Swiss-Prot record:
A Pfam family annotated for this UniProt entry: Sugar_tr
Region (Disordered): 492-557
Major site of localization recorded for this protein: membrane
Record-given protein name: High-affinity hexose transporter ght4
Location within or outside the cell: Membrane
Gene name for this UniProt entry: ght4
Organism: Schizosaccharomyces pombe (strain 972 / ATCC 24843)
Amino acid sequence: MGRTLTSVLVVFISMAGWLGGADTGSISGILGMRDFQSRFADRYNPITNSYSYSAWRQALLTGTVNAGCLFGAMLSSPFTEAIGKKYSIAFFSGCYIIGQILLVTAVPSWVQIMVGKLFTGLTIGALSVLSPGYQSEVAPPQIRGAVVSTYQLFQTCGTLIAACINMGTHKLRKTASWRTSFGINILWGIFLMVGVLFLPESPRYLIYKGRDEEALRIMCQTAELDPESEIIQTNFNTIKSDIEMEMAGGKARWPEVFGKEVRYRTVLGFLTMLLRELIGNNYYFYYATQVFKGTGMTDIFLPAVILGAINFGTTFGALYTIDNLGRRNPLIFGAAFQSICFFIYAAVGDRKLIYKNGTSDHRAGAVMIVFSCLFLFSYCCSWGPMGWVIVGETFPIRYRSKCAAVATSGNWLGNFMVSFFTPFISNSIGFKLGYIYACINMTSAFQIFLMAKETKGLTLEEVNELYESDIKPWDSYKYVRQIESRRIHFSKEEEKREREKSKGYRGQEERFIENADGADNDDSSASSESFASAGAHSRSVFPRRSNVSEESHPTWV
């Protein structure tokens, strides 16, 4: 039951990432569709009979959704505290459907497109807080990192599928080309909204609401252990005592998010999510067409499919690295490697891609594509999914919803900055923008080294203890090793006790059998007149169930 429940949990909750990826992947291709441009672009060239967007129009069409995500992330907190993560996810999934309907029914006014993107952004931002948070609270600690990473995996899958849909619909006549792409996104919203209703609520939220029995049952299902298990009882009592201790201080207020107790973690989460976007992942998707044109490729929809496939395929690597290599090392070394990729990308693009006569160097374009793919491989194995993991597991429960909202808002602020300002900066300095991204990546590596603590394999309560301690981030792996050693010792002791109980039971059973055999021998030598009394004596050898304690014979229930 536990593995089935965890699998279902992964699929349905990670669909929240799919919604965001599908929206991003669809708009990037829709902006290039002929019918959409004829209705919503603000520039027309009669000589070439082509449409284009001004920097302001393109920035508003692509950046508005991220502005909505920024506010949506903050909206998630009051909903979580009122109705829990499960029903909040269902509610915002419905809001996503409404936003996509606004896009499908847009009239020839770009303002409705912008409003639809803003409304959709509100829901994507809220779900980006709720979904990883739900997964972190329900998943067992041994696989929590991999479970939360599936949010990013589904996000990249949604982007890839949307790019493929655009490639298939852009040749449809008139509005069907872009309305179909927007309309299919409605199906993903329905899938998540209905599916999440069949999943359990977070055990920590249930304990917070006083529903202890239901919380205990869910913990047993996900861990595949009995309620009497010492591991389950220890975890349950730890969670309950921590919640009671934190709730004794009353409901957290917004100013407390930056109070002494959690200020460090709030800043860590916000900076990690902000830098997650500023290190340049989305830059490649916004300007992939220009780079691929340098290699001689003319199909404007194919680059998005190629990069989307790489983005999706390499994210599987994170499912291994995050719970085997930990959090710190992949983030630090990933950012350093990405800095090198961006530096080479910028140098080649600035000096070699476009000649003064307007022609392109195909070899330079190929080199840039290679380092774009290497960057995406590193990003998808490190910063892509691990930012969500840090947000999901770092904060104590009393502050969790508010701190996670503030931290996730950093993600959408960074995304908005990249999508809105990149057209203006790129028009001014071209591929030199890559040098800026290279510097940001190096800054990100130092930020993780100085601030983030290793939390691989720890329960959320152990993570809280780690951040409350004076252990330096670069020494935190020692704490993890101590916890792992203690856990292994505890597991061995429990196995030893079980073996001793089993051994004691087998010894009792052997004695019962010997006594029974002795009684049978007495019966065979007894006279027929004493047979009845001998038979009665043989039955009295076996103790009655009421006379055998549960402690001495634990398998009798």
